[in-house]
Amino acid sequence: RNVALVGHGGSGKTTLLEAALLSTGVISRLGRVEDGNTVSDYDKMEIEKGYSISASVVPVEYKKMKINFIDTPGYFDFVGDVNSALRACESAVILVDAFSGIQVGTEKAWNSCKEYNIPTFFLINKIDKENVDVDKVVTDLQHKFGTSVVMLSEPIEGDVRESLTEAVAESDEELLEKYFGGEEFTDE
């Protein structure tokens, strides 16, 4: 599986990848973009500038599954690398800084994912910052990108389950008929 990490510059794509590498035991110490010691930003210019300039493929094994994460630049001066990465991926994760919310890079990443018809997930990052309102970010994402945006990080029950079911139903005509007919969805 190839998964692109896309989003506005500074949204935390490289840091998320570092956390995945640490969690899976690939690295023993979390690298920091600011310190110039991350796995995916190894180019001299990237280390000097403190941000990704070109896409990097980093394989991660998790539960006997290999995932090739493609860490892409967030600044759209490097959009060619982003588009190349998306063409090689089965899915994409758009990172959104919880404090900053939707930014130009978020919108451009979404548009590129839609252009290549790639299943896309939003990951709201940096939720530990002070004065962050995750519900507002989710609402903003829904207003900007449509009702198919639902929060999955909460237990899938109650209102969240209903929102998820409704969003899935809206994505397919056959599922929509099942939904309005009161039928339960299968796991497929």
Language-model-detected regions and their locations in the chain:
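P-loop NTPase switch module centered on the Walker A-proximal segment
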Residues: 1-96, 102, 136, 143-145, ...
